[in-house]
Amino acid sequence: MKKRISTIANLVQSFNPKLVYDIGCDHSYLTSYLIKTNQNLTIVNSDISKNALLSNYQKFKNNNNIHFFVSDGFNNLPELNINPKIGVIAGLGGLKIINIISQKENFINRFVIQPQSNLIELRSFLSLNSWDIVNETLVQDREFIYPILVIEKLKKPFKLTKELVILGPKLINFKDKHCLMKHYQCLLRVYQPKQKPSLMDLKIIETLNKIITSYESS
């Protein structure tokens, strides 16, 4: 978990934000990491669990720059007049991330996101709804490989090809090919067992098999 959190924090810090919204903050590990390097950073932590937030509040109650809100996504979040701002949604399923960034209350145009599932469906949504994937990386933490994306809202639509939706427009040039292939193999195991695969499922299986086979024979 430490490597995953540190990677997310480094991506957040690369934009030099003054305000961070950690949506679905869970135990506020990201807040703990961020304030070590920037005590002046304003951080809004939100979660649907009141009990989790109460526990987190006790850790940070003496820091006036750290705030806590019980909220399902943006439903109960205030838009603070501090810029630049960035949102983080980490450790939630891809479909839940889609739900959150689609909310009409969403006022953030840049996010670091780390989906636990439905990565390809998430990329497809981003492509169809004018969100640009400006960065994507993989982090291996113990036996798990986590995809982490930086996305920004575009003014004009920009659609990815099906192949790039499946493979990731930034991941195809990922330097650690062994880690990348392990990631693709994990994705393949999600789609292969389906009894009634859709046309998109079949395209995903074909594309992943093709690139994995190419890597293994090289």
Curated annotation (Swiss-Prot):
Keyword annotations from UniProtKB, A to Z: Cytoplasm, Methyltransferase, S-adenosyl-L-methionine, Transferase, tRNA processing
Organism lineage string: Bacteria, Bacillati, Mycoplasmatota, Mycoplasmoidales, Mycoplasmoidaceae
Alphabetized SUPFAM superfamilies for the sequence: S-adenosyl-L-methionine-dependent methyltransferases
GO biological process: methylation; tRNA processing
Organism field: Mycoplasma genitalium (strain ATCC 33530 / DSM 19775 / NCTC 10195 / G37) (Mycoplasmoides genitalium)
GO CC terms, sorted: cytoplasm
Family (UniProt): Belongs to the TrmK family.
EC number per UniProt: 2.1.1.-
Main subcellular location: cytoplasm
Protein name, as recorded: Putative tRNA methyltransferase MG248
One of the Pfam families matching this protein, by short name: TrmK
InterPro entries: SAM-dependent_MTases_sf, TrmK
UniProt GO molecular function: tRNA (adenine(22)-N1)-methyltransferase activity
Enzyme type, top EC level: transferase
Compartment(s): Cytoplasm
